[in-house]
Each structure stands twice: as structure tokens, then as C-alpha cells.
Design a protein with these regions (language model features):
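Charged, solvent-exposed interaction patches on well-folded alpha/beta domains
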Residues: 1-41, 57-58, 64-78, 87-258
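Acidic-histidine catalytic/liganding microenvironments
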Residues: 82-83
């Protein structure tokens, strides 16, 4: 009796399995094994960080590969995991025979204790390739005094609200300062940011003037912008040329020259 009750379900399952296998065979015959969909053009926009040859090597996409034999998302993920100097990549298939790859370079927002190590705007650590050293020569350098801080490439540094404590948090807060300072209307350009002092973030400008900001006051972007604006207004004043060091104290609403 039980066999008689289950027999229709078993037949239905067998039919569904057969339909699925037939669909898979037909799909491969029509698409994955169809020479009509063999790649004839691979169009690559490589940027600067990765060459066209490197992209071809990592992705494995070349003339003759079938468009339906690979997942564009999986190939993209492999490319980004292999080439950390890329921030993003777009891989698109265009029927019947074209693949387009657009690579987007990871742009350094600051160097980190070395001309060869950098942070992007999100705190991702990556190496600056020798061929890119001159291109990023003007990117400001975050330093930690006599104790260089060199986290492994591939990490993303973290920050927390409030007063930054610890080297990593101070580095991330200095990164925010560098990003918020990078505006064409500023009266000064940052060259170095030293996070080694537990009380002050020490900024060195391109014309060798020193600006000190109090860590306890750099609690968020609003406070950072206020401090930079105060420094900006002070350095625009012709009277500031008599000074080389400027202490920005938000709580007092003043900049003290020395």
C-alpha cells in the first residue's frame, strides 16, 4: 500500500530530474559549447596600477573562451583579491563574442611610515608599486616618530568615535585630517602628519610650517574642519609669516603662534 502511494511521487521526481538533466545538456549544447559564443574581443581599460597583461593572466579571459563558461562576478572577485592595488573592477559580457574589463585603481590618500606603503580613503593598507612612486610623490606621509607603524598590506584599519587612543586610531584620525585638508581653497598643503605625540597631532606643511592640533579635540569631522579652518585663516594673515609653529586650540577658539 505504501509503495502504491509513493509511486506517483517517485515518478514525478524522476521526471523532474530528467527534465533538469535534459535542460543542462541543452544549455551546454546551445551556449557553453556553442562556438558562436567564443570570445573574439577582450576590451581592457587597465588604469595605472595593473597592466593589461596582468589582467589577462589573472582573469584567464582571452580569445576562444566561451562567454557562458565563466561567472563574471567570480572572475571580478578573483581579480580584486589578487591585485590589491585595484579598488574595483567591472566585467561585462556583450553577446555574442565580447568581454569588457574596466579596472579602477586604488588611490592613496596618505602614505604610512614609508614611501612604499599607503592608505586609501577607507583605511585599506596597500603597497605603492615602484612604477607609481613618482605619480604619488605629493601624497602626504603619516609618521609615528621613531617607531614606524607598518601594518600588513590587505588590512583595513579601524577607528572609533571620540578621542583616538592607540597608534591605529590616531593614524585613522590623521587620515581624516589629510582627506579634509585636501581642498584647493586651503592656504597650505600637508606634507607630513606625525601621530607619535600623545597630546598633539603634528602637521608639517609644504612650506615647513608646523601646525599642532589637540587629539582630545579631534572627536569628529566637524571638529577637524573647524581646526583646519582656524589654521587656514591664521596662515593667510601676513602677520603669521613671523611664526613657524601654530597651536590650534578649539576650546579657546584661538591659534597660538610660536
Amino acid at each position: 500500500m505504501r509503495l502504491r502511494e509513493t509511486a506517483p511521487w517517485l515518478a514525478l521526481l524522476a521526471l523532474a530530474t530528467g527534465c533538469f538533466l535534459a535542460w543542462r545538456w541543452l544549455s551546454r549544447a546551445m551556449f557553453e559549447r556553442n562556438p558562436q559564443y567564443a570570445i573574439r574581443r577582450v576590451e581592457i581599460s587597465p588604469g595605472f596600477a595593473v597592466s593589461e597583461a596582468e589582467i589577462r593572466d589573472v582573469t584567464g579571459l582571452r580569445e576562444g573562451v566561451n562567454l557562458f563558461s565563466f561567472s563574471a562576478a567570480e572572475v571580478r572577485n578573483r581579480l580584486l583579491l589578487t591585485k590589491r592595488n585595484l579598488a574595483d573592477a567591472e566585467i561585462a559580457k556583450t553577446l555574442p563574442d565580447t568581454v569588457t574589463i574596466v579596472a579602477h585603481d586604488r588611490i592613496p590618500a596618505a602614505k604610512l611610515c614609508s614611501s612604499r606603503l599607503a592608505l586609501d580613503a577607507n583605511g585599506f593598507v596597500f603597497a605603492i608599486l615602484p612604477r607609481d612612486a613618482e605619480r604619488y610623490r605629493a601624497v602626504p606621509l603619516i609618521e609615528n616618530g621613531a617607531s614606524p607603524y607598518r601594518p600588513d598590506a590587505g588590512r583595513t584599519l579601524s577607528d572609533s568615535p571620540g578621542t583616538p587612543t592607540g597608534v591605529e586610531a590616531r593614524v585613522m584620525r590623521a587620515l581624516r585630517v589629510a582627506l579634509l585638508c585636501d581642498r584647493p581653497e586651503r592656504a597650505f598643503r600637508l606634507s607630513n602628519l606625525d601621530v607619535s605625540n600623545p597630546t598633539y597631532l603634528v602637521l608639517l606643511t609644504g612650506d615647513n610650517r608646523v601646525i599642532r592640533l589637540v587629539w582630545e579635540e579631534l572627536v569628529d569631522d566637524t571638529a577637524i574642519l573647524q581646526g583646519l579652518s582656524m589654521a587656514d585663516d591664521t596662515l593667510r594673515d601676513p602677520a603669521s609669516r613671523a611664526h613657524k609653529r601654530f597651536d590650534v586650540v578649539l576650546s579657546a577658539g584661538k591659534v597660538f603662534g610660536g
